Regions:
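Bacterial N-terminal signal peptides that target proteins for export
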Residues: 1-9
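Outer-membrane beta-barrel biogenesis signature
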Residues: 20-38, 206
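Glycine- and aromatic-enriched membrane insertion/assembly motifs of diderm outer-membrane
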Residues: 51-99
């Protein structure tokens, strides 16, 4: 537990040392194994290293039977100085196929957004993922939305994913996650569509 706290404090301190101008999107948690998750993402604009976004969040997952769970999430966008409450609804079939629906409300912009994700776990640690980001952008459906498709492989200590994002801001996307413990991890994500890099830390516990 002490190592988890130290890891979280180090990442949080680094986050606050960066400049704070860009937005940060979060697309992790579809297979969250624990009740609590603290996630600290730091997004860096590759064209302007001073353009950095920090938007940490905490979520609590409540299982409703074996196939369904609901996770209230509270996120704070440091750049906008705005709270972003969310509700995540997760449905799974035999712990192999997952669907995650995210309802997101930006309190400062007074906008409701919606994102839909799915993951299918294949044998030998392989997986395929899809995300429909901003399928509803607060004003219209399918306006400025992004479709992302990736394939990946999970090992005991790491997970790698790579794929492509189309429609708005198309480009190659890749993700590398290193498991510090079975439930806690560090992550690096590249998004060729937004020309950004994201570094993050997740702490998960019951």
């Amino acid at each position: 537990m002490k190592n988890r706290i130290k890891l979280f404090l180090v990442i949080s301190a680094l986050s606050l040392l960066f400049g704070m101008k860009a937005n940060a999107q979060v697309f992790d948690g579809i297979t969250q194994p624990t009740k609590f998750r603290v996630w600290v993402p730091v997004s860096i604009d590759l064209h302007n290293s001073k353009n950095v976004g920090v938007a940490p969040f905490v979520g609590y997952k409540q299982d409703i039977g074996e196939r369904f769970s609901i996770t209230p999430v509270l996120q704070y966008n440091i750049n906008k100085e705005a709270f972003v409450p969310q509700v995540w609804l997760n449905f799974n079939v035999a712990k192999k196929f997952y669907i995650l629906s995210r309802s997101i409300y930006d309190t400062k912009a007074d906008l409701y957004k919606h994102t839909l994700s799915a993951t299918y776990k294949l044998p030998l640690g392989f997986m395929v993922d899809g995300t429909w980001e901003n399928m509803y952008n607060g004003k219209k459906f399918c306006d400025g939305d992004r479709l992302q498709f990736v394939g990946g492989w999970a090992h005991r200590l790491f997970v790698v994913n790579a794929g492509y994002s189309c429609r708005a801001k198309p480009g190659f996307i890749a993700n590398f996650r290193w498991k510090v413990t079975p439930n806690d991890w560090l992550q690096m994500k590249y998004d060729g569509g937004t020309k950004s890099m994201q570094l993050g830390c997740a702490l998960q516990f019951n």
